[in-house]
Amino acid sequence: MSTEDLYQDDVEMLDDYEEPVPEQADQQQRDDEYAEHAFGYADSDAEHEEQSGDHHESPMLDSLELDLTLRCGDLRLTLAELRRLDAGSILEVSGIAPGHATLCHGEQVVAEGELVDVEGRLGLQITRLVARS
């Protein structure tokens, strides 16, 4: 019997609804716990409700630096319009009210807020945190 025949026999014996192999289940649980601790997101609302009163912070992850971006809207220009831009040009931005911005981690929206002056520098005052799911 060839290796392919043995493999095919194993595949035919598998049930689509079998429980995951213990090692896979353990790895999935570790991955879920890491994501939850690192980003504060739980896989289900029930899990989140259970943990909201008993949230364990991970001191090892507290020093993890994340790249966040502030988005203040969208605009679309033709190449000709882009080439005509010069100092003093004013661009109309759509998708958000003046003075507002969205705080994002990659494509994930984290919060929304209002742009404010912080001792001569631009800041964001959070007005709404996106629900963690």
Curated annotation (Swiss-Prot):
Subunit structure: Homotetramer. The four monomers assemble into two tightly bound homodimers. Interacts with HrcQa.
Bias-annotated ranges (Acidic residues): 1-21
Induction line: Negatively regulated by HrpV.
Keyword terms of this UniProt record: Cytoplasm, Virulence
Keyword match Cytoplasm: yes
Family: Belongs to the FliN/MopA/SpaO family.
GO biological process per UniProt: bacterial-type flagellum-dependent swarming motility; positive chemotaxis
Family matches, as InterPro entries: FliN-like_C, FliN_T3SS_HrcQb, SpoA-like_sf
Record protein name field: Type III secretion protein HrcQb
Gene Ontology molecular-function annotations: cytoskeletal motor activity
